[in-house]
Amino acid sequence: MGPWFWTFDALGVPDWVAQRLWWGTLLFAAISGVAYLLRLFRLPALAVWPAALAYGLSPYAVAYLGRLSGVLLPAIGLPWLLGLTISSIRVRSWRHPALFALVVATVGSVNLTALALVGVAPLLWVLFALVSREAPPRRILGAVARIGLLATLTSAWWLAGLTVQATHGIDIVRYSESAEVVARTSTAFEVVRGLGYWFFYGGDKLELWIEPSFQY
C-alpha cells in the first residue's frame, strides 16, 4: 500500500482517487485470479465468471474493502498462488515460480498467519499431484524447490523485520487481538453469513469501530 499511495501522491493525484483505484485494483485482482485458476481446469466461461465474481464481491470482501483493505490481500492472492502452483508443476520453467514469489511478496507482508493459511491450498495441490501422478515426482519437487527459493528471496525484507519484532519487540497482539478475542466471533454461523472477522464487532467508549455493523 505504501508504494501505491506514494506514487499517486508524487503524481499529484488526489487521495480519494488513489484510494478508489486501489479498491478497484484489489477487486480486479481477486476476480481475475479466480478466473485464471478455473481456466486451468478448462471450465466454460459460463461457469468461470459467476464463480469469479462471487469470490471477488463476497460479503467479506465488500465489508472490509473500505476500512481494512490490507486484511484482504492474502485472500486475494489465494487463487493466484494455487493457479501458479498448478502451472509451475505442469510447465517446467522459472516463469510461474517467479510470479508465485512476486504474489507472496505482495500479499504476505501484512499478516504471516493469513499467508500460512492460504498457503495450505498450494501445499494440498502438491500432495494431490504426487498422489495422482499428475506429473513425474521429480518435476513436482523441482517446482516446489523453485517456488520455495524465489519466495524466500522476495520475502526476505519483511521476514527479517518480523524476526526482529518477534525477538525484541513488544507482544502487541496479546493486547490488541488475542486468540480468545479473535476466535470468539469466528463461529460457524457468522462465517456462513460472510462475517466472523473480530474487528467487525469491536468498539470502544465512544463508538463502534464499524458503525454499520450494529444492525447485523
Predicted feature residues:
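Periplasmic/ER-lumenal interhelical loops and adjacent helix-loop junctions
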Residues: M1, G148-Y216
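Short hydrophobic/aromatic helix or loop-helix immediately within or flanking a transmembrane segment
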Residues: M1-D15, V107, D204
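Conserved helix-loop functional segments at active or binding sites
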Residues: D9-V13, R90-W94, L208
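Juxtamembrane loop-transmembrane helix junctions in multi-pass integral membrane proteins
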Residues: V13-V17, L43, S109, R139
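Extracellular/oxidizing-compartment recognition motifs
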Residues: W16, F41, G66-R67, G142, ...
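Detector for conserved single-position "signature" residues within domains
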Residues: W22
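Membrane-embedded helix bundles of polyisoprenyl
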Residues: T25-F41, L46-V131, A143-L162, H168
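Membrane-interfacial, low-structure loops and terminal tails that flank and connect transmembrane helices
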Residues: R133-L141
